[in-house]
Regions:
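Outer membrane beta-barrel
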Residues: 124-302, 321-336, 376-380, 386-387, ...
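Outer-membrane beta-barrel "beta-signal"
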Residues: 467, 493-507
Length: 507
């Protein structure tokens, strides 16, 4: 009976004309303990069509809906192009990590194509996918094609983040790639353990490098993004595995920077790292919802060799003989009927920078620390403002002062390079199909910690336009202006422009 009533309610939500029907239903289910705060927050941030999809997915994962019942809710017109909305722009660790940094990827797999005249259009039974241990499982992914044009040299041709020194590579370049595509497995809904609901995620992309062959550019290697398991009680959760960090959880919206978050090295600290995490959140019915997260992480400070290696060797962070620690406190309230979230997070790790001075091996202490403020303000259904501001030292793991976050023993940056910055993005939902984003990011490294030739400042201006043809097909265009300054080498400061066109197929 419970399953029937929820299915009937979802069908009503799909037919209702009011934009917040699914949101109201989600709040009722949260009050009854069927939905978690995380799931409710994700649904409330979505538009009408996407909210129904997220709600259906959550109920399917909990075993309340079967896939055949989901098909009855959606009907043959589930992906009708006239009823498409973008999910709001910036994902945080407050929502399931599989959705992080991808505001255009729905969380419900597409139903098989059906024609209106097909005799099975209303009665098709969809076989559920399960693991060997009988966990319900979803396969998801995004096949992403990018074409790009750069007016000058950069650190990464297809995902440029930093402009090369003036004169080092003055030639423009063009190319295409699919290596930002990603694929994953998500499981949730099996038997409870100690009263907790189990879930997990494994996600891969193709940014692990290119094959060492003359024609190996298109033979991209697999890279691990996510691999974690969770246990969720009513108000608390624990997680172990590789996931997005608690520190600095937001990312700008971009299909040009899908594998490496936009504004990386321009004010956006980010990383996915092995960790053990604890979370507590207040009840969804409270006017102001509170989320507290604490985590112990792998102590890496971002000094891993850039060449391919077969074994891990101790680095600066590992020599600190203990984990790094992080925490984040976030409060979510309302602006009218929409969520507004402000969070404050911190990171600390201890390490030893080992080097040779005058023929003697010495160690210099490195305190890797950071403080970050994040905000997501959904002012209206047409406009959302989001961003971050940070300050810290030795944050190379987060692509802050990347490649120069801790310099060699005997140099000014031997204890770690101090850096600060931030980014902001204005998201405009023009209608159900079109979305435009304007963003700016800045990272400034402390000059007294640097050596000549290091990057002193990096700025990025970005705008993109996205056309969501359907929930499973998006077309996007993006332009960026990169401005990179080099320490004590002003004549080598560089500016490049980059343009990108992307086509995303979501399944």
């Amino acid at each position: 009976m419970k399953r029937f009533l929820v299915t009937l309610s979802l069908a009503f939500a799909c037919m209702a004309q009011a934009e917040d029907s699914a949101g109201r239903l989600a709040r009722i289910l949260a009050e009854k303990g069927i939905l978690t705060n995380d799931e409710l927050a994700n649904i409330e941030r979505a538009g009408a069509d996407e909210a129904v999809r997220l709600l259906s997915s959550a109920l399917y994962q909990k075993g309340i809906l079967t896939q055949s019942e989901m098909a009855r809710v959606y009907g043959p017109a589930a992906g009708a192009p006239g009823d498409v909305r973008f999910a709001p722009g910036v994902a945080t660790t407050y929502v399931p990590a599989a959705a992080v940094a991808t505001a255009v990827v729905p969380t419900v797999p597409a139903s098989p194509p059906q024609t209106a005249t097909s005799p099975s259009a209303r009665t098709t039974q969809i076989q559920e996918l399960t693991t060997a241990s009988h966990f319900p499982m979803q396969i998801y992914g995004t096949v992403l094609w990018n074409s790009f044009y750069n007016t000058g040299g950069s650190n990464i041709e297809d995902i440029p983040l930093v402009a090369s020194k003036r004169g080092s590579d003055p030639y423009s370049n063009f190319g295409m790639t699919v290596r930002q595509s990603r694929f994953g497995l998500r499981y949730q809904g099996g038997p409870e353990v100690w009263g907790a609901k189990l879930s997990g995620n494994v996600e891969l992309d193709l940014l692990g490098g290119a094959a060492p062959l003359a024609n190996g550019v298109g033979m991209d290697l697999v890279r691990l993004r996510l691999a974690y398991g969770r246990m969720d009680w009513k108000n608390t959760s624990i997680e172990a595995g590789q996931d997005w960090t608690v520190f600095s959880p937001l990312n700008p919206i971009s299909l040009a920077s899908f594998a490496i978050p936009a504004m990386s090295t321009s004010g956006n600290p980010w990383i996915r790292s092995p960790q053990f995490r604890f979370e507590w959140h207040s009840d969804a019915t409270q006017a102001a919802r509170v989320l507290l997260q604490m985590a112990a992480l792998d102590p890496n400070v971002g000094d891993n060799p850039t060449t391919v290696v077969d074994a891990r060797t101790p680095g600066i962070g590992e020599r600190g003989r203990g984990p790094a620690v992080e925490s984040r406190l976030a409060v979510t309230g309302k602006i009218g009927e929409r969520d507004a979230t402000v969070g404050l997070s911190g990171h600390y790790g201890r390490g030893d920078n080992v080097g040779v001075l005058n023929g003697v091996t010495v160690a210099r202490p490195v305190d890797s620390w950071g403080v970050n403020l994040d905000y997501t303000l959904a002012v209206s259904k047409y406009f959302t403002l989001a961003g971050e501001a940070f300050s810290g030292r030795g944050l190379g793991l987060f692509s802050v002062a990347s490649g120069q976050s801790v310099l060699a023993v005997g140099t000014p940056g031997e204890h770690g390079v101090l850096a600060s910055g931030g980014w902001a993005q204005a998201q405009f939902n023009l209608n159900r199909k079109w979305q435009m984003n304007l963003a700016y990011g800045l990272e400034s490294d402390e000059g007294s910690n640097l050596i000549t030739g290091s990057r002193g400042k990096n700025q990025t201006y970005m705008t993109n336009l996205m056309y969501k043809v359907s929930p499973h097909f998006t077309w996007a265009w993006e332009w960026r202006r990169l401005m990179t300054n080099y320490q004590n080498q002003q004549s080598l400061n560089a500016i490049i422009q980059t343009a990108n066109m992307a086509i995303a197929y979501v399944f």
